[in-house]
């Protein structure tokens, strides 16, 4: 994967609601909040919590070269992804373990927790002996 995030997957210039990635990264958090969907906008307008402020400061003070090697570990699944997060690797806690999330421009406006689910999909096997009425007559081998 290339480290140039200005072009999207199809080779077109990335734009979020009519703004390029460079324009978004130059904007203030309050200006970006006006472009976000309602739920994310509301969480920013009401004020980020102290833990979210700490995470934002950690991202701002971090070296871009060390992000892939040392991801930022966080439990904040409800943190909206801002343009400043593009290119940063997070380890997001899903209730069981920390899962890596490499932030790409297409993720702007979503929450960190949306990219690693807390529940795994259940794939049931065959029913056991006696589990259903019809399985009572299956030979035991």
UniProtKB/Swiss-Prot annotation:
GO terms for molecular function: rRNA binding; structural constituent of ribosome. GO terms for biological process: ribosomal small subunit assembly; translation. Transmembrane segments: none annotated. One of its GO terms (cellular component) is cytosolic small ribosomal subunit. It comes from the Archaea. Keywords: Ribonucleoprotein, Ribosomal protein, RNA-binding, rRNA-binding. Signal peptide: none annotated. SUPFAM superfamilies: Ribosomal protein S19. The keyword Ribosomal protein applies. InterPro entries: Ribosomal_uS19 (IPR002222), Ribosomal_uS19_CS (IPR020934), Ribosomal_uS19_euk/arc (IPR005713), Ribosomal_uS19_SF (IPR023575). Belongs to the universal ribosomal protein uS19 family. Protein S19 forms a complex with S13 that binds strongly to the 16S ribosomal RNA. PANTHER family: RIBOSOMAL PROTEIN S19P FAMILY MEMBER (PTHR11880), SMALL RIBOSOMAL SUBUNIT PROTEIN US19 (PTHR11880:SF2). NCBIfam families: PRK04038.1, uS19_arch. This is Small ribosomal subunit protein uS19. It comes from Halorubrum lacusprofundi (strain ATCC 49239 / DSM 5036 / JCM 8891 / ACAM 34). The gene is rps19.
